């Protein structure tokens, strides 16, 4: 994959969940409730088209928010009813197994948005990642199923510019994990934590497959708000302090010079 452009459109507000991100092949940026998300998305797409010199006609749309839930499921299909016959597994057989491993949402107002294959089992032999061409009597699929609020998903799709075809919906955590973790890292097992402004997305990979996804309804904006509250400084100033001077590891802050900040009454004070 080649990244042709990376663009973003600014937004005024950040909520503690339900972040809506638009990802195309050139990775434009995010939008949130509380602003005109259609306008923000269109602006990001326009910038990406200008930068890449190409027209964007389709997109993978990622979503996040505390309405997202996941579970691991399994299901299968019989390949042949004759005990002395074997069947070569083809793509339609895989689709049948995946459909059997797609549970229905237990709650009204929710829907299955994504079914990710983890592994397959053929006649009791497990751990198969690609069963195409293998012969057997029964095929079972182990899947990672993501459900979400039907209304949230509907609003998300409506926020995508009408000129763009939504190819697939993907969780933000899964997209981040597939992007930043190498196949070897996912194979050994890893946790990918994507800290956004209003949400933190967590993805757990085991033996190369996604096993768990979660969304925590807080992120970097919470840190900015805390700095603004404690120092009684504007949010814009607090964000600049966080980006330019904050350290996640206290030892790295040793020797950091004192800095001046703007206070709520427009005076300035020195902090360290």
What do these predicted regions represent?
Residues 188-230:
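Glycine-rich phosphate-binding loop of actin/hexokinase-like ATP-binding domains
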Residues 2-191, 210, 234-272:
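Nucleotide/phosphate-binding catalytic cleft detector across ATP-hydrolyzing
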